[in-house]
Amino acid sequence: MGYNKSLRYSRHEGTTCVIDNHHLKSLGSVLNDVRRKKDRIREAEYEPILDIADQYMVTEDPFRGPGKNVRITLFKEIRRVHPDTMKLVCNWSGKEFLRETWTRFISEEFPITTDQEIMDLWFEIQLRPMHPNRCYKFTMQYALGAHPDYVAHDVIRQHDPYYVGPNNIERINLSKKGFAFPLTCLQSVYNDNFERFFDDVLWPYFHRPLVYIGTTSAEVEEIMIEVSLLFKIKEFAPDVPLFTGPAY
């Protein structure tokens, strides 16, 4: 086959010289088109799942879910924590909260005055160093599924703990899966017999936490421990509207 001059400009042979920008695309735009196509394919795969998931409501943080938070502060106490060890926060034996230096009980009466429905229970602990200019972190370990007859040790050795959350505040959810808390008059039970309040009312329906606190310091540190229980109360809507009229 001889030389054919027309083949120089044949588009089918790929030798066409394009000099206008209408037929040119930058490499970045080509990559963006590929990325958008992948995104559309991924969205098409997730559409059936999203249709089912849209039927459910969840919260990113269960503590910030629906309901009213009612706090009962059990005690504030100063503890001395030795290096490489962790101390038990409370042993749940009435008012004997392992006091060392001093203990101040905050709540004399139960804050829930009516028979409300308890949706959730949280154990909250706040930690603060007692001496200024101390550079260490608070460590923590806890257990929820301990046997009721298990006697916890007051001091344990640190072994793979984790750091306490931001602002030195940590919350632990004590709810048992599949257990509903009954409507009871918690205020009268709490005021009449505080020592038996936990064993008779709370622990049959919620986990009894064993919480240990330590520090990363190489010296003996004095820390302030504030222990609270946070009850999440269901807020009931009124049976009848408070106002009548066209606007309601």
UniProtKB/Swiss-Prot annotation:
Pfam families attached here?
Polyhedrin
Judging by the UniProt lineage, the source's domain of life is Viruses
> Which key words tag this protein in UniProt?
Viral occlusion body
Claim: Cell inner membrane is one of the keywords in the record: no
Q: Name one GO molecular function term.
A: structural molecule activity
Which GO terms of the cellular component aspect does the record hold? viral occlusion body
Claim: Membrane is one of the keywords in the record: no
The family assignment reads: Belongs to the polyhedrin family.
Q: What does this protein do?
A: Component of the virus occlusion bodies, which are large proteinaceous structures, that protect the virus from the outside environment for extended periods until they are ingested by insect larvae.
Q: Name the chain's protein.
A: Granulin
- What organism does the UniProt record list as the source? Adoxophyes orana granulovirus (AoGV)
The organism that produces this protein has a lineage beginning with: Viruses, Viruses incertae sedis, Naldaviricetes, Lefavirales, Baculoviridae
